[in-house]
A protein has these predicted regions:
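Local sequence-structure signature of Cys/Sec-based thiol-disulfide redox active-site neighborhoods
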Residues: 1-30
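Conserved short-loop catalytic and cofactor-binding motifs
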Residues: 10, 32, 45, 67
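Loop/helix-junction capping segments adjacent to catalytic residues or to phosphate/diphosphate-binding pockets
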Residues: 15, 38, 73
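Short, glycine/charged-enriched secondary-structure capping and boundary segments
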Residues: 20-22, 45, 71-73
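Structural signal for short hydrophobic segments within the conserved structured cores
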Residues: 30-32, 62
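Thioredoxin-like thiol-disulfide oxidoreductase module
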Residues: 34-52, 78-85
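Structural micro-motif
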Residues: 49-58, 68
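Non-catalytic, surface beta->alpha helical segment in thiol-disulfide oxidoreductase systems
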Residues: 59-85
């Protein structure tokens, strides 16, 4: 399974949903909280092509996007393959 990194904020319901889906899939992930951390937010945005909303999810070298993007991948049947790569 490729490394998974998810940038989050503690009060973000979409972050919790994305983490729940990854847990349901049995995927271990590194969570990076950007709560009040401008340097972490800037690093996330730079890595995510300027997107500054959370969550931002990376599977291996691929930027998946946010929570809706993760669920769209799952709904299309492509998330399991990405997690197994």
């Amino acid at each position: 399974m490729p490394p998974i990194v998810i940038y989050t904020k503690s009060s973000c319901p979409y972050c919790h949903s994305a983490k729940d889906l990854l847990r349901q899939k049995g995927a271990a992930f590194e969570e990076i909280s950007v709560d009040g951390d401008r340097a972490a937010q800037a690093a996330m945005a730079a890595k995510a092509g300027g997107r500054s909303t959370v969550p931002q999810i990376f599977i291996g070298a691929e930027h998946v996007g946010g929570c809706d993007d993760l669920y769209d991948l799952d709904g299309a049947g492509r998330l399991d393959a990405l997690l197994a790569a």
